Amino acid sequence: MEMEAPHILISTVSPEKGKKIDTFYKHSKYIVKVLAPTELSEALFQYAEYFFEAAHKITEFILYAEHPDIGKLDTYFFSIAFLYRHCMELGLKAIGFQTIQDRDERKKFVKETRHNLAVILSAVEEKMSWTRPKEEMEWLRKYFADLSQKDRESDSFRYPFHIVWEPGDWECEGRFVIKNIFDEQTNIDLVKFANKFEAAYEIIRKWYKKETESAFEWKEVDPVFIETGGYYYVQSVVGYKYRRADFYPYTKAYLETANYLKWYMKNATDSGNCDYNARLFLPMCYLYRNCVELSLKTIWFEEIGEDFQIKCKLMLDNKHSIAGMWKQIKPYVLEYSRGTDEPEYIEVIEDYCMQVHKIDGDANKFRYPMSNSMQE
């Protein structure tokens, strides 16, 4: 009998001195084996399936809960959106790699299309000798065109805002400014939001598998990325002007949805089903990894009294580097901890950060089966 998921999914584990992230017990029933890819097209599609399933499981969890939780609806939206969106990107690249076999050509394809779903779709259509029926492709083009207006580079649901450079004029210098992802409060219909992702992925999956039967889910939804409204307990309310604690909903979302996947895998394994371990492990790892990055950026951006322009510049300079962000905040953390018993604890945190960075220094390890240079 399947256990009910815990209502509270906050972490109760504390860092321990000397503990290693990659330590495992060979007789444990919870061991997950991650195999090196042999063919990148197949590996990309496998990753797409993993991220799709993770998104689907988490969405089911919050939409069909016995006691709906508004807090989860308003925050888990961000990690759900990323997981669904990422499986589309992986699926499209898997289709492209079915035709693009040369390593240098694959590298060029990835570099030129980056993460923009509309651009990737267009490039794949140009290269493929087979596509889906005309009506399906037209729906997909419209949907990805609208989606890309909100999330062109796959970062709008991983971070609370964009930092952009605003050029100056003859009277003043240029400066960094915050560009909010959502400029105003938006009540998103999460059911429609998820159904559209699933409709798009149905087309992509059939395209990759070269199936001849028509997709049908797209017929039930409009090719518009976000629709507002819906029943109160299926709404995700997002979007406020920039303020302190802007990172909190994202950090909460990535931490707690990772914890949910961990709970789900453990519960399934305890029930004799180990299949979910392999399928949900990588999405779980990425959710945790992004939570660490978000937590460090929260400290840097919201807790440290540094000049705003310096904060923006150094955050951009360090991109996704956990080691880089830790290096920036460490002097401030040590300064604030003087006269307390925290310095030793800070050393433990630093060790954990360095371990995570060593495993995944650029936030790609758990998202893709290869690097941008096509190294597997």
Model-derived segments and spans:
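Domain-scale activation on soluble regions of proteins
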Residues: 1-376
